[in-house]
Amino acid sequence: LQRRRQRQMCIRDSSNLDYIQVDMDAKDNRRSKANMASMDPDLFWSTVNYGFHYQYMHNTLQLNREIIDDKPFFSNISRLSGISSTDWSWGPLLADLDNDGWKDLFVSNGTRREINNKDYFNEISLRPIAKDSLLYYTSKIPSEPIANFTFRNNQDLTFSDVSEVWGLDDKNFSNGAVYADLDNDGYLEIIVNNIDQEAQI
């Protein structure tokens, strides 16, 4: 789980801790293909041969199944649960956002420049670039604000995307996020840090 953002919390009525780890898998096909990182097959299999699991860029929701021989046994259910793709993600928050007793999921995401955008870098690779034009070309790297994701816990190990319904679909470049009951009314607020924009509550 190097270089990845994660949180631990029980997502169901159980004493076993589950955890979520977020990565950079885009939800829509265009962004997914344009920003797909290059795969190095030799490095991929070398990593597997060293005893690590297959490495893919998508979120994982590790469901704590049971304890076997004093060790926890987990299953990745992110695709089944509907939360595997939330773009360039940073701050996963598992909290009861609608006060129904079940943990919902908020994921902040965004990057100021699409540094993996293959279309852009293929295009400029065909041009001669002078040293003094590097800043210019860097400033032209595509930049697309996207909405954060909010998922309601369906109480059956699946989640529904309620970002728009709950009014949490502003497009921006978010990273850090926390939750707190700022006004002591029993409902949680979400505080989000945005790049080149004001923070949001």
Give the residues covered by each predicted segment.
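Beta-propeller blade signature
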Residues: M57-R65, A147-N153
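Acidic carboxylate motifs that coordinate Ca2+ or other divalent cations, activating on Asp/Glu
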Residues: S14, D100, D104, D185
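Short, conserved, GDST-rich strand-edge loop motifs in beta-rich repeat architectures
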Residues: A26-H53, T111-P142
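Single conserved hydrophobic/aromatic residue that forms the stacking wall/gate
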Residues: L1-D13
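Repeat-based blade/solenoid architectures
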Residues: R5, Y54-H58, L80-L93, E144-I146, ...
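Hydrophobic beta-strand segments that make up the repeating blades of beta-propeller
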Residues: Y19-V22, L105-N109, D185, E189-N194
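Blade-edge beta-strand/turn elements of extracellular beta-propeller
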Residues: I68-G82, L157-L168
